[in-house]
Amino acid sequence: QLDLFSTDQRVGAGFILWHPKGAIIRNEVEKYEQELILKHGYVLVYTPHIAAERLFEISGHLENFKENMFGAMEVEGARYRPKPMNCPGHIAIYQSQQRSYRDLPIRMAEFGTVYRYERSGVLHGMLRVRGFTQDDAHVFCTPDQVPEEIGRLLDLVDEMLTTFGYPYTIELATRPEKALGAEEEWVQAQDVLARVLNERGKAFEIDEGGGAFYGPKLDFKLIDAIGRKWQGP
């Protein structure tokens, strides 16, 4: 109704076409968020929209996230896929040169567009789509730096959501059935997340088995005008 965006079956279900008015709003939001992440010590990077399938084999996405990925395309005998997440590309940037512990923490951020297969029945406006741009970030740090970096990230997210006036709840999502890594590593990571939240007086709920295949996570659930919760940052 506001002529901000549309979808078109010729383009494909779950893919958003941004109209001029919507593009203005999106650009203003991205400018604000870019200023915010730079203020919080992040550096900007860019990674390709598609990558060699081998990258997603190494990262574990093909084994653990394949049902949410689009199919492979073959070019000159090599297989490529649209990226479902930005993390493999950020890790490749980190690994592109020798690093010292003195360089850490390194905080990388990207407005990265990703593509995920969602069943047509669960697509919902702009809230559940097949292609979307994340204000994504990855922090490379030593184990000793983890608590401080989690705290800094909590500050960043709170500042952003408070600026936009979103009430939110926090959920600590734990190890899913299908997961990489030793269970004791998961327990350690989950304990650090819980400890930092408690130290900062942040109320949270436990989402048993709701973590990503590669690690536990904090889910910020945004609450809309009629009380529904939506996946946030």
Task: Show which residues each predicted segment covers.
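Active-site proximal loops enriched in glycine and acidic residues that flank catalytic Cys/His/Asp
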Residues: 49, 84-86, 113, 136, ...
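Conserved alpha/beta enzyme-core scaffolds, especially Rossmann-like or related mixed alpha/beta domains
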Residues: 4-20, 128-184, 208
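Metal-assisted phosphate- and nucleotidyl-transfer catalytic regions
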Residues: 162-231
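Hydrophobic alpha-helical membrane-association signature
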Residues: 29, 149-153, 189
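Auxiliary tRNA-acceptor-end handling modules of aminoacyl-tRNA synthetases
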Residues: 1-123, 127, 139, 162
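Short acidic-glycine loop/turn motifs at beta-strand connectors
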Residues: 74-77, 141-142, 223-227
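Active-site-adjacent "gating/activation" loops or surface patches in catalytic cores
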Residues: 117-120, 228-232
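Surface-exposed charge patches
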Residues: 35, 159, 195
